């Protein structure tokens, strides 16, 4: 849609009426919105500012189904109808613009707006120069889940780098860290891509493998996406013309269910807050030869295989008395295509979070790994992705062969965590 068609759009009486109705919905007075919602995400704050930062600009929007106002209006629709704003292109992360895909996606066209959708999880994982022609500003609005190896923050970094190279500003509409902004846990990762620089080639960013460990971060980083953007920009050589639109009302000790915002699945198998809380530690089991419950009603809350002695593993874990969590023997059948043991009954352990304030999900994951290894020392295996997601190339051997306790493995990370915390505090907004 070019500038001339935008002017025509606002002259069409039917569309003008639609625009007025939509703007009434998204332009709720701040006091009324605050009374109904304790936390206002960045898109609501931007609307309250009458889109001043975006006016007169051709906007490229990086988003998915989680980009929405407190009233449930998608950020796509908000910006498409915002006065003085010309939305010209959409960019989708892993799982697509609607968050329903489990495979890599090709670029396409949005049926609602007619805008091009450029996939950032296909042949390229960052906006390429051709995609940015006719874009004056990139805007990012995606709900993340607080775990380093969830790919959306890798997409954030690569998009910021692309914006810097194209000489266009980058705007982040901030959203809550659903598992809080206080606890920081896990190993600080070794990045899979070298530090950003103007000398790096476009081809270096084309692969998606680095998205799970693009910068040195602990597994559970305790930062919002806006804070991460500030950290990436200031510490890792991006140097983008960055603006973060902060939330209103969010506090660091809030979990998502403290915000009064509606949960929207950020990916097909991230169906509730409990799974997000467990994911920093137990999500790494996707790199093993277990099913993690994908294709069930409770992914990341059950782990198993047809060969697993569930009762023995559950007894081993009960004896460990892992704080804040329980493990019970169960059976389940994964159904997602391409996942281990699809259509086969698996024996496993089901996980219940009893006290998330006491739970260290990273150490809980280490306990689960060690317990299964003790019961099945020959059968239980992990691929090369385990070291990447945990952030420690020695952790598997230490847990499964050397017999070091989860606490001893975690102690190896303390020095790097302390250094990260001293850097992190410079970029916190709340």
Question: PLM features: what roles do these ranges have?
Answer:
Residues 98-104, 171-203:
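Glycine-rich, charge-decorated loop segments at or immediately adjacent to ligand/cofactor-binding or catalytic sites
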Residues 202-279:
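Conserved anion/nucleotide-ligand pocket segment
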Residues 250-330:
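Glycine-rich, aromatic-lined ligand/substrate-binding cores of catalytic
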Residues 86-94, 173:
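Short internal beta-strands
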Residues 103-135, 147:
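Glycine-rich oxoanion-binding loops at beta->alpha junctions
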Residues 15-27:
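Bacterial N-terminal signal peptides
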Residues 144-156:
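Glycine/threonine-rich flexible loop motifs
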Residues 304-412:
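Conserved functional hotspot residues or short segments at active or partner-binding sites
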